[in-house]
Amino acid sequence: MLKVENVTAGYLQSPVLREVSLQLEDNECACVVGANGAGKSTLMSLISGLMRPSSGSIMFNETSLIGLSPSKIVDLGIIQVPEGRRLFPRMTVAENLLLGARNARARPETKASFEKVYHLFPILEERGKQKAGTLSGGQQQMLAIARGLMAKPKVLLLDEPSIGLSPILVAEIFKTVGGLVNDGISVLLVEQNVRAALAVSSHGFLVERGRIVLSGKSQDLVEESAIKRGFIGG
């Protein structure tokens, strides 16, 4: 279980997040939604160890993540797929995937992990020898997610995976993401595409100006006036 409690964080003296609390249960897909600049990506950086909060706690099971290095957090099984994909464009698809399996948890199961991600994203097996930089945007996003899965995550942090993709590709990728919980992977999804994120998750959190202003079951949040008015219409 991942638990963020009363976390405040920011840059210099300007808070980006203010007293944020959320919880991700085992085998759950939850989403954090909101407009650009609301603080969603900062939350991901805090959980991944790229930033430290000024106050509050971040716990994974019984372990505090605050003060741990990003590599140690990876070893615990928390893997981030960052916004913008951040692939190695001159390396092949297979080489990019192999980089995801470098931690101690993943190395012994590299072969099985290749089989798994190729089953989830067959196009990546077809393009295994192709340079990552020559893939389409949708294929690059599939590769970024697959590289994260190569690390054998217990928790997968997905930061804005729908950016720049067509609605058809978004639906395809989100369907795969929603199915990861059946493999024992918890998913925390950060998204501006509120409709798609709520459709694939069981719980959601709406962030506005650094604060969580709404939370609950995704099916209930869809009917909230603030969600309808600001993000999905109605």
Task: State what each model feature region is.
Residues 12, 68, 93-111, 120-122, ...:
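ABC-type ATPase nucleotide-binding domains, specifically the catalytic core motifs of the NBD
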Residues 33-35:
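The feature captures the beta-strand-to-loop junction immediately N-terminal to the Walker
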Residues 56-64, 76, 109-114, 216:
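Conserved ABC transporter NBD signature motif
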Residues 131-135:
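Conserved ABC ATPase signature
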Residues 148-149:
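ABC ATPase C-loop
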Residues 152:
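Conserved catalytic motifs of ABC-family nucleotide-binding domains
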